[in-house]
C-alpha cells in the first residue's frame, strides 16, 4: 500500500484594507451625527456637472462623497441600522452620498433646480422650445446654407456673413434633435439642453424609511392646488355643521339666513324679506293655473297680464317718477299684501 502525499494549500484572507476600515468608520460617524442620507446617481453624469455641483453646495453640504455601495452597507450593518430594502435595491452603480440634518424635501427641491446648460446631441429630446434668434451668425456662406434651408430658417447674406432674418422655432418640447440641427446649434453656440443631478432618494434615519425621488421632489403647484381644495372642503364642512370659528361663522350666518328665507317662503310666512319671493311665487302659480286651464280660462273670464319690460329711463323726470312709485310701493302694508294673495287664490 503506497502512501500518497500531497501539498495542502491553505487560503489566507487578505486583511481588510486600512482605507476601507477608515471610510466605514467615517460613514458610521456621519450616520450617528445626521438624520438624512441623500443618494445621487452619478451614472452617465458628466464630471464637469459634478464639479460645479460640489462647488455650489460645498458650504451648505459639507459632507458629500462618492463611496462604494458595499462600504455604505457595511457602515449601516455595523451601526445596528437595518437598511430598508428599497434603499438597498438603489445602491447600484456609482453614487454620491450626502449626509445632512437639513429637511430632505427642501434640499431635494434645491438640487432639482440646479442645472448646467449643454449642447444638444443627435437623438436628444428637446426639453423646451428651441429658438434660433435673428441676427448675424458670424458664419460665412457655403454648404451650411442648405442646412438652414432644410430646417426652414430664413437667411440673407450681409457683409460676407449669414444673417438669420427672424427668430425661428426649430424644435418643440418632445421633438427629437436631428444630426443637422444638433450640428447647426453647436455652430451657433446655442446650448438648449439642461443637465441636472439625478436624485435616487433619501434615507430618513428617524423614520427608518427610504423616500424615493418621485416622492421627494415635490410638485409645488400640485400641492398648492391640493391645499386649496382641502381648505375649500374643510370650509364647506365647517359651514354644514356651523363650526364656531370666525372664518366659518360669516358663511354660516349667511347660509342660515338663506335657509330660513327658503323655509318662510315655502310656508307662506309674510315678512318684508319674503314678500317679493311670495309675490313672484304666487304670480308664477297663477300663470301655471291659467296655462293648465287653456281656453277654459277665457270662458271663465280669467286673464293674467304679463308685465312688459321697463323701458330705459332717458330723462331725469322719468327717474324721479320711478322713485316716487317705488316709495308708494314701499308704503303698501302687510295686510294689503295678504289681501291681494287671498284674492288671487280665492
UniProtKB/Swiss-Prot annotation:
Task: List GO terms (cellular component aspect).
Answer: cytosolic large ribosomal subunit
Output the Gene Ontology terms for molecular function.
Answer: large ribosomal subunit rRNA binding; structural constituent of ribosome
Locate the compositionally biased regions of type Acidic residues: 322-337
Which Pfam families would you find in this protein's record? Answer: Ribosomal_L10, RL10P_insert
Instruction: List the keywords (alphabetical).
Output: Ribonucleoprotein, Ribosomal protein, RNA-binding, rRNA-binding
Gene3D superfamilies in UniProt: 3.30.70.1730, 3.90.105.20, 6.10.140.760
Which intervals of the chain are annotated as region Disordered?
305-346
Query: Domain of life here?
Result: Archaea
Gene Ontology biological process terms from the UniProt entry? cytoplasmic translation; ribosomal large subunit assembly
PANTHER family the UniProt entry points to: 60S ACIDIC RIBOSOMAL PROTEIN P0, LARGE RIBOSOMAL SUBUNIT PROTEIN UL10
HAMAP family attached to this UniProt entry: Ribosomal_uL10_arch
Q: Which family does it belong to?
A: Belongs to the universal ribosomal protein uL10 family.
Assembly: Part of the 50S ribosomal subunit. Forms part of the ribosomal stalk which helps the ribosome interact with GTP-bound translation factors. Forms a heptameric L10(L12)2(L12)2(L12)2 complex, where L10 forms an elongated spine to which the L12 dimers bind in a sequential fashion.
**Job of this protein:** Forms part of the ribosomal stalk, playing a central role in the interaction of the ribosome with GTP-bound translation factors.
Q: What is this protein called?
A: Large ribosomal subunit protein uL10
Organism source for this protein? Ignicoccus hospitalis (strain KIN4/I / DSM 18386 / JCM 14125)
Amino acid at each position: 500500500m503506497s502512501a500518497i502525499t500531497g501539498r495542502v494549500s491553505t487560503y489566507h484572507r487578505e486583511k481588510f484594507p486600512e482605507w476601507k476600515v477608515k471610510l466605514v468608520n467615517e460613514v458610521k460617524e456621519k450616520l450617528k451625527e445626521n438624520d438624512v442620507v441623500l443618494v445621487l446617481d452619478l451614472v452617465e453624469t458628466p464630471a464637469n456637472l459634478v464639479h460645479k455641483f460640489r462647488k455650489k453646495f460645498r458650504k451648505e453640504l459639507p459632507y458629500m462623497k462618492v463611496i462604494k455601495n458595499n462600504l455604505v452597507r457595511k457602515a449601516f450593518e455595523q451601526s445596528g441600522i437595518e437598511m430598508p430594502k428599497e434603499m438597498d435595491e438603489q445602491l447600484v452603480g456609482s453614487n454620491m452620498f450626502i449626509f445632512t440634518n437639513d429637511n430632505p424635501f427642501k434640499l431635494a427641491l434645491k438640487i432639482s433646480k440646479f442645472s448646467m446648460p449643454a449642447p444638444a446631441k443627435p437623438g436628444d429630446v428637446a426639453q423646451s422650445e428651441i429658438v434660433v434668434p435673428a441676427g448675424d451668425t458670424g458664419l460665412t456662406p457655403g454648404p451650411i446654407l442648405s442646412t438652414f434651408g432644410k430646417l426652414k430658417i430664413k437667411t440673407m447674406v450681409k457683409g460676407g456673413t449669414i444673417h438669420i432674418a427672424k427668430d425661428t422655432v426649430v424644435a418643440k418640447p418632445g421633438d427629437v434633435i436631428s444630426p443637422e440641427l444638433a450640428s447647426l446649434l453647436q455652430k451657433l453656440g446655442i446650448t438648449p439642453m439642461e443637465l441636472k443631478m439625478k436624485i435616487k432618494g433619501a434615507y430618513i434615519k428617524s423614520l427608518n424609511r427610504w423616500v424615493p425621488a418621485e416622492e421627494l421632489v415635490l410638485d409645488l403647484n400640485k400641492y398648492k392646488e391640493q391645499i386649496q381644495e382641502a381648505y375649500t372642503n374643510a370650509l364647506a364642512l365647517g359651514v354644514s355643521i356651523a363650526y364656531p370659528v370666525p372664518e366659518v361663522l360669516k358663511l354660516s350666518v349667511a347660509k342660515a339666513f338663506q335657509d330660513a328665507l327658503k323655509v318662510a317662503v315655502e310656508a307662506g310666512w309674510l315678512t318684508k324679506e319674503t314678500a317679493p319671493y311670495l309675490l313672484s311665487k304666487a304670480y308664477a302659480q297663477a300663470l301655471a293655473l291659467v296655462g293648465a286651464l287653456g281656453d277654459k280660462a277665457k270662458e271663465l273670464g280669467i286673464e293674467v297680464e304679463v308685465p312688459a319690460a321697463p323701458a330705459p329711463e332717458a330723462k331725469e323726470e322719468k327717474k324721479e317718477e320711478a322713485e316716487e312709485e317705488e316709495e308708494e310701493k314701499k308704503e303698501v302694508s302687510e295686510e294689503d299684501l295678504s289681501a291681494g294673495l287671498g284674492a288671487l287664490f280665492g
